[in-house]
Amino acid sequence: MTIPQLDGLQIEVQQEGQGTRETRRGDNVDVHYKGVLTSGKKFDASYDRGEPLNFTVGQGQVIKGWDEGLLGMKIGEKRKLTIAPHLAYGNRAVGGIIPANSTLIFETELVGIKGVQKGE
C-alpha cells in the first residue's frame, strides 16, 4: 500500500483494511475518529456521536493532514495520524479546545467509500 510522505504527517497503519480499492481524491467517505492533543486530552470523537464523519477527500472540507493522511486507505483500515500544526489549524486556536500551534493525533477508521462495497 502506498502511504503519502508529507513533511509534518506521520501515518501508522494499526489495522489493515479489506479488498483492493483504496481511497483517492474525490472519494466521498465515512470515517470514524478520535482526536487527542499530544497531552492525551481528547478534543473530539465521532464515536461519541455514533455517526462517522462524511466528507470528500482532497476537497479541503477537512484539515490538510486528513486530506493527505487518509489517501490509500481500504474499507475497515485503521490509521493513527500524527499531524503537525501547519497541516492542522496552524496558529489558530479552535473552540477553546485546541490551542494554537497544536500537533494533533487522530485514530481513524475508514467505514465506507460511497459506491464501493466492502471487500471490493
Swiss-Prot record:
InterPro entries: FKBP2/11 (IPR044609), PPIase_dom_sf (IPR046357), PPIase_FKBP_dom (IPR001179). Its EC number is 5.2.1.8. PPIases accelerate the folding of proteins. It catalyzes the cis-trans isomerization of proline imidic peptide bonds in oligopeptides. It catalyses: [protein]-peptidylproline (omega=180) = [protein]-peptidylproline (omega=0). One of its GO terms (biological process) is chaperone-mediated protein folding. Residues 26-114 form the PPIase FKBP-type domain. It is an enzyme of class 5 (isomerase). Binds to the immunosuppressant drug FK506. This is FK506-binding protein 1A.
